[in-house]
Swiss-Prot record:
EC number: 1.2.1.71
UniProt cross-references to InterPro entries, sorted A to Z: Ald_DH/histidinol_DH, Ald_DH_C, Ald_DH_CS_CYS, Ald_DH_CS_GLU, Ald_DH_N, Aldehyde_DH_dom, SuccinylGlu_semiald_DH_AstD
Active site: 244, 278
Protein name: N-succinylglutamate 5-semialdehyde dehydrogenase
UniProt record, GO biological process: arginine catabolic process to glutamate; arginine catabolic process to succinate
Listed PROSITE patterns: ALDEHYDE_DEHYDR_CYS, ALDEHYDE_DEHYDR_GLU
UniProt cross-references to Pfam families, sorted A to Z: Aldedh
Organism: Pseudomonas fluorescens (strain ATCC BAA-477 / NRRL B-23932 / Pf-5)
Assigned protein family: Belongs to the aldehyde dehydrogenase family. AstD subfamily.
Catalysed reactions, semicolon-separated: N-succinyl-L-glutamate 5-semialdehyde + NAD(+) + H2O = N-succinyl-L-glutamate + NADH + 2 H(+)
Intrachain disulfide bonds: none
PANTHER family to which the protein is assigned, alphabetical: ALDEHYDE DEHYDROGENASE-RELATED
GO MF term list: succinylglutamate-semialdehyde dehydrogenase activity
Protein residues bound to NAD(+): 221-226
Length: 488
């Protein structure tokens, strides 16, 4: 089966065989072989050869290809949404919003490129100072499985817009979405070699990251892999590395007037996408006392009624599955470990069907757990921590190596100002779900959540480097020479 796209040709992978399955039915929906190191090298060479001509195209010419890609996405929106839903397990309504985000990324990237890069000039003495930008060359994009269309798209689109050529290595759990996305680029008229698809798992990723022919790498995924890449690229200032990783995100709740609004926002923060967004709330900080008890009782009651089902189930569920049976097992094991260490199950997460990666929402009170693991449990498992006062809540919120997202539900603007000032996170929300962020806003975190902001508004900064010039059309001897220099 032809699973790789290199130099404008679909080719069969020669590496390890792997499959993609529907996480609920376990039906195989894609099969193929990954790219070997030799095939990775071929793709790098193809990208290197295609780069000069693509970079020399005018910005408007490149924009026209991107706009054709957006048109292709729109024409295949239903097909792509179904593909995303089938391969990830997320409900169709949510998969459709991902396709919309992919389309919207085109206009956002063009606007950001014009604002952040482009060309600027001004007089400087008898010359003109000019600032222009040039693409890096060949960049690799490593995509995640939770948003297999939208998140790699957030790197690929601005990279191509800036004039780079791209090597796309998607998650081995979502190869079908990647294949369909590349087909849309082909329909858009992207020249051969400008975008190359390298399917595969760990060995393919290692070969691509280690290839000396790449000029940079944009990664979205786990902190473990991201940390490995950071170590691998240490001492290589000639290569750009941008990492978007996970978080152990806190959502702090104060006593608010609208209890149900708080409950709904918590559910949207913790259980959207079956908890498989890097910005999902992992830790819910609730005040001690009667009001906090009432909030938790209401949260548990509502969460217990959340619809969980297959991606195409009708009426549509709120939550689909997690990505795989392996992921489901790991989450169930994590819950058991927390319970063994003293957590109290307010609402136990369950796996209704042993051979389906469907999990129901789980809520554990971990206040009594002496040493809570600082890790991202990537699924619908929310940990509750009771706090005594607001300073205690902020200290607990910051008690993590991560720093991606943090949120506050409060009726007090003064409290929010304090929270915003003292929180250590790249995204800080007030009375909005933790997973909410403007598509055009810089996205990323601090600490173990990553470095840089190589998507959305700041993407252009990482896809092109600035070149400062001092220019004048004529070479003229200055009227006054530097002391000590004589031309007579």
């Amino acid at each position: 089966m032809s699973t790789l796209y290199i130099a404008g040709q679909w080719l069969a992978g020669q590496g390890e065989a792997f499959t993609s399955v529907n996480p609920v039915t376990q039906a195989v929906i894609w099969s193929g072989n990954g790219a070997t190191a030799a095939q990775v090298e071929s793709a790098v060479q193809a990208a290197r050869q295609a780069f000069p001509a693509w970079a020399k195209r005018s910005l408007e010419e490149r924009i026209s290809v991107l706009e054709a890609f957006a048109a292709s996405l729109k024409s295949r929106a239903d097909e792509l949404a179904r593909c995303i839903g089938e391969e990830t397990g997320k409900p169709l309504w949510e998969a459709a919003t991902e396709v919309t985000s992919m389309v919207n990324k085109i206009a956002i990237s063009v606007q950001s490129y014009r604002e952040r890069t482009g060309e600027k000039s001004g007089p400087l003495g008898d010359a003109t100072a000019v600032l222009r930008h040039k693409p890096h060359g060949v960049v690799a994009v490593f995509g995640p499985y939770n948003f297999p269309g939208h998140l790699p798209n957030g790197h690929i689109v601005p990279a191509l817009l800036a004039g780079n050529s791209v090597l796309f290595k998607p998650s081995e759990l979502t190869p079908k979405v990647a294949e369909l996305t590349v087909q849309c680029w082909i329909e858009a008229g992207l020249p051969a070699g400008v975008l190359n698809l390298l399917q595969g798992a760990r060995e393919t990723g290692i070969a691509l990251a280690a290839n000396p022919g790449i000029d940079g790498l944009f990664f979205t995924g786990s902190s473990r892999t991201g940390n490995h890449l950071h170590q691998q690229f240490a001492g290589r200032p000639d290569k750009i590395l941008a990492l978007e990783m996970g978080g152990n995100n806190p959502l702090v709740v104060e006593q608010v007037a609208d209890l149900d609004a708080a409950v709904y926002t918590i559910i949207q923060s913790a259980f959207i996408s079956a908890g498989q967004r890097c910005t999902c709330a992992r830790r819910l900080l609730v005040p001690q006392g009667a009001w906090g008890d009432t909030l938790l009782a209401r949260l548990v009651a509502v969460s217990a009624t959340i619809e969980v089902g297959a991606f195409d189930q009708q009426p549509a569920p709120f939550m689909g599955s997690v990505i795989s049976l392996g992921a489901a097992r790991a989450l169930m094991d994590a819950q058991q470990q927390l319970l063994a260490n003293g957590a109290v199950a307010l609402l136990e997460m369950t796996q209704p069907q042993a051979q389906a990666a469907l999990l129901t929402p789980g809520i554990l009170d971990v206040s009594a757990v002496a040493e809570r693991p600082d890790e991202e449990l990537f699924g619908p498992l929310l940990q509750v921590i009771r706090y005594a006062d607001f300073d205690d809540a902020i200290a607990e919120a910051n008690n993590t190596q991560y720093g991606l997202a943090a949120g506050l539900l409060s009726d007090s603007a003064e409290r929010y100002q304090q929270f915003w000032l003292e929180s250590r996170a790249g995204i800080v929300n007030w009375n909005k779900q933790l997973t909410g962020a403007a598509s055009s806003a810089p996205f990323g975190g601090v600490g173990a959540s990553g470095n840089h902001r190589a998507s959305a508004y700041y993407a252009a900064d990482y896809c092109a480097y600035p070149v400062a010039s001092l220019e004048t059309p004529s070479l003229v001897l200055p009227s006054a020479l530097t002391p000590g220099v004589r031309l007579s």
